[in-house]
Amino acid sequence: MRNVTAAGRNVDEAVQSGLQELGLTKDKVEITVIEEGNKGFLGIFGKKPAIVKLVEKIDPIQQAKLYLQTIAEAIAGKSDVTVQESKKTVRYHITGEKAALLIGKRGQTLNALETLTQLALNRYPGQYKNVTVDAENYRLKRKETLSQLAIKLADQVLKTKKSIQLEPMPSSERKIIHDTLSGYANHQIKTYSMGEGENRHLVISHKR
């Protein structure tokens, strides 16, 4: 967190001097007036400069980005992280020559990075956005794969009338399957979750 103490003939001038030194705009800093300054008698005697302290505001989303980038580069070398923010979510997308190393088996490494980044963001008060971490557009490809799998398994359930239990997967992936099968085959299919923690999984069954 950068900070600077600056002086000027008045508070505004001191603030501008500090902003220029930090290379920031006024909305990016916290300003404390240490001395308001004094023009002095006839502008000469007793004259005192205004003194202010500027402290760079912490941007939780950018701090989480730096945290993620540090981990990504420790695993996959030089990496870039871009951020897309909406009202309820923050999406971090990692690119780099070895970004595929960050995915892991069925996205397990990516899911771990997502959890760590979510925890890093949650450290800051008032930050309640859902975090998504992606690399090599894995999330989109995975969504397409899961949707196709859901349809295939649902058709099997319709044919055999026997429930199918899927392997454990994160809530975001369970939701993809649930949404895909919502209303499928005239609402003959239902999905629900079972298990706890890492063993929580989805069941696809026929409505009797």
Curated annotation (Swiss-Prot):
Residues 140-208 form the R3H domain. InterPro entries: Jag_KH, Jag_N_dom_sf, KH_dom, KH_dom-like_a/b, KhpB, KhpB_N, R3H_dom, R3H_dom_sf. Disulfide bonds: none annotated. PROSITE patterns: R3H (PS51061). Keywords: Cell shape, Cell wall biogenesis/degradation, Chaperone, Cytoplasm, RNA-binding. One of its GO terms (cellular component) is cytoplasm. It is found in: Cytoplasm. It comes from the Bacteria. One of its GO terms (biological process) is peptidoglycan biosynthetic process. Residues 5-55 are annotated as: Jag_N domain. Its main location: cytoplasm. One of its GO terms (molecular function) is RNA binding. Residues 58-135 form the KH domain. Forms a complex with KhpA. Belongs to the KhpB RNA-binding protein family. PANTHER family: PROTEIN JAG, RNA-BINDING PROTEIN KHPB. Has an N-terminal Jag-N domain and 2 RNA-binding domains (KH and R3H). A probable RNA chaperone. Forms a complex with KhpA which binds to cellular RNA and controls its expression. Plays a role in peptidoglycan (PG) homeostasis and cell length regulation. This is RNA-binding protein KhpB. It comes from Bacillus subtilis (strain 168). The gene is khpB.
